[in-house]
A protein has these predicted regions:
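Ligand-binding clefts/hinges and TM-proximal coupling segments of bilobed small-molecule sensing domains
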Residues: 25-27, 159-174, 215, 245-277
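Extracytoplasmic small-molecule ligand-binding "clamshell" domains
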Residues: 29-104
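Periplasmic-binding protein-like
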Residues: 46, 126-133, 199, 203, ...
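Extended ligand-binding regions for polar small-molecule ligands
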Residues: 24, 65-69, 73-74, 137, ...
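A ligand-binding cleft/hinge motif common to bilobed small-molecule-binding domains
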Residues: 91, 107-117, 163-166, 188-222
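C-terminal motif of bacterial Sec signal peptides marking the signal peptidase cleavage site
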Residues: 17-22
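Bilobed "Venus flytrap"/periplasmic-binding protein-like clamshell domains
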Residues: 47-49, 60-74, 130-182, 194, ...
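Acidic, polar ligand-binding/catalytic clefts
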Residues: 82-145
Length: 277
């Protein structure tokens, strides 16, 4: 078959168009590309009082929600163009690596192990692991007072669980569930004796039931909350870091805390220093 000059030009044009389309698709699949398209999918928790809760009307409220909306705004995406997706603790890295979310703002502690799979901007908050018990319990005063007769509940895939396994497993019965609200339900019905996770999370649950629940003891870990995103996306990580610093500097960070966690009994900490690794 004789290939004409016109046919060759047609093949060349099609190849160029296909390459351009591929490049555009690749760019639009990035966080920056999604932001330029005016929309983002952000992973959060759905059941953490004061931090991130989905209301009966489908709206979302809480400190992590406010941080997520502020960061999205600095990336050019308004609140109404954000899709919030539930991000259970044990699934967060997978959701980021699979592209199910653009980034995650979900009391997500920065650890070296997690940084092998995903990147983190921040921290935007620093918390500490604590214990939540029933108001009537006077025997548990801290992690050191737990023993093999006591049942402790926390969430699969959390740093709280790992800390217990690494440092206290020999004398604690540990129940691992999917969410902290499930653990709190077990605490309230007497199935477990305590719930452990970060103090800011527990303060939210205690604030909803101050006659039934209380925090006890000193914190026994340091948890730096970061915004998790796909590994290697340095440009987006730096943009999010800039947004967090701006949120702290313009007072929005403090206001968000006071309007969400503050009323539930949380006490704010000194604003964290961003780790630009």
């Amino acid at each position: 078959m004789r290939i004409t000059h016109t046919f060759r030009l047609g093949i060349g044009a099609a190849a160029i168009a296909l390459a351009a389309s591929a490049c555009g698709g690749s760019d639009s699949a990035t966080v920056d590309g999604h932001a330029r398209d005016g929309e983002l999918t952000i992973g959060i928790k759905f059941d953490q009082p004061g931090l991130s809760v989905r209301g009966q009307d489908g709206s979302f409220r809480g400190y992590d929600v406010e941080v997520a909306k502020y960061v999205a705004g600095k990336l050019g995406v308004p609140p109404e163009r954000i899709t919030f997706k539930e991000a259970p603790s044990a699934q967060r890295e997978t959701m980021i690596m699979n592209g199910e979310v653009d980034f995650i703002v979900a009391t997500y502690s920065i650890t070296d192990g997690r940084k092998e799979k995903v990147d983190f901007a921040g921290p935007y908050f620093v918390a500490g692991q604590a214990l939540l018990v029933r108001m009537s319990d006077t025997d548990i005063t801290g992690v050191e007072s737990l023993n093999s007769d006591r049942k402790l509940c926390s969430v699969k895939g959390s740093t709280a669980v790992q800390n217990i396994k690494d440092n206290h497993a020999e004398y604690i019965q540990l129940l691992e569930l999917d969410t902290y609200s499930q653990c709190v339900d077990k605490l309230r019905d007497g199935s477990v004796d305590a719930v452990t996770t970060d103090d800011i999370i527990l303060a939210g649950f205690a604030g909803l039931a101050p006659e039934e629940l209380k925090l006890v003891g000193e914190t026994f870990s340091l948890e730096k909350y970061g915004i998790g995103l796909k590994k290697g996306d340095r440009e987006t990580r730096e943009k999010i870091n800039d947004a967090i610093e701006r949120m702290i500097a313009d007072g929005s960070w403090q206001r968000a805390f006071e309007e969400t966690i503050g009323p539930l009994g949380g006490s704010t900490l000194t604003p964290p220093v961003i780790d630009r690794y």
